[in-house]
């Protein structure tokens, strides 16, 4: 049953010499930017395919008087993982490939390496640009990650969502308001 329920790749991770010794019981996909297609369509926004397009869209959303991103990093004693997820993504896309990323992870290059600093500069575009984040920059570190996306499902007096995009792993749908969970994949998507 296990072999039919999971990809051969996942099965292979727990297999040695043709014998399955262990296996995945869950998987979470990272690097997802969640959005609500209906909200994009209603305003004529296109789904960005590049970082530059995402920044241009964020600028447009701000110019339209709204907030592009929900962003929360508070996670009790483990708050750093949310920024790390962003940094990992950006480094893999803007750095010198997986070899440099692997060096960073194994502490063979320092946090002040130009590749790491470049990734931090990209992330800073989201975190420190006025109007980009619900509650502003200061709210990022005090907003619980599990509630960070809530404004995406709430409307202001003009019928606009509190934010349009939220970057988080696939597990975040279990934190969504109940009505949004029922519509996952249709009301809100990646």
Regions found by a protein language model. Name each.
Residues 1-6, 92-118, 181-184:
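Short, solvent-exposed loop/beta-turn-alpha elements that line the ligand-binding surface or hinge
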Residues 1-31, 61, 82:
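Hinge/lid segment of periplasmic solute-binding proteins
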Residues 17-19, 90, 94, 176-190:
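Ligand-binding "clamshell"
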Residues 58, 104-143, 190:
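Glycine-centered hinge/linker elements that transmit conformational signals in sensory
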Residues 51-55, 137-155:
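Short helix-initiation/N-cap motifs at beta->coil->alpha
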Residues 70, 163-168:
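Paired acidic/hydrophobic, glycine-rich loop segments that form the ligand-binding mouth/hinge
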Residues 1-8, 13-15, 38-49, 151-158, ...:
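Extracytoplasmic "Venus flytrap"/periplasmic binding protein-like
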Residues 22-28, 43, 69-78, 101-115, ...:
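Short beta-strand->loop
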């Amino acid at each position: 049953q296990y072999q039919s329920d999971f990809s051969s790749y996942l099965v292979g991770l727990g297999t040695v010499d043709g014998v399955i010794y262990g296996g995945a019981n869950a998987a979470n996909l990272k690097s997802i930017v969640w959005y609500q297609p209906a909200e994009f369509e209603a305003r004529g926004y296109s789904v960005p395919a590049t970082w530059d397009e995402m920044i241009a869209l964020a600028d447009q959303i701000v110019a339209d008087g709204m907030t592009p991103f929900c962003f929360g990093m508070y996670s009790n004693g483990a708050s750093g993982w949310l920024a790390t997820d962003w940094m990992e993504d950006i480094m893999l896309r803007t750095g010198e490939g997986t070899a440099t990323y692997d060096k960073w992870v194994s502490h063979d290059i320092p946090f002040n390496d130009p590749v790491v600093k470049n990734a931090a500069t990209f992330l800073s575009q989201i975190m420190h640009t006025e109007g980009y984040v619900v509650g502003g920059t200061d709210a990022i570190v005090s907003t619980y990650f599990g509630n960070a996306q809530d404004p995406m499902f709430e409307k202001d007096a003009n019928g606009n969502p509190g934010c349009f995009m939220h970057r988080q792993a696939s597990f975040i749908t279990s934190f969504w308001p109940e009505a949004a969970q029922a519509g996952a994949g249709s009301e809100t998507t990646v």
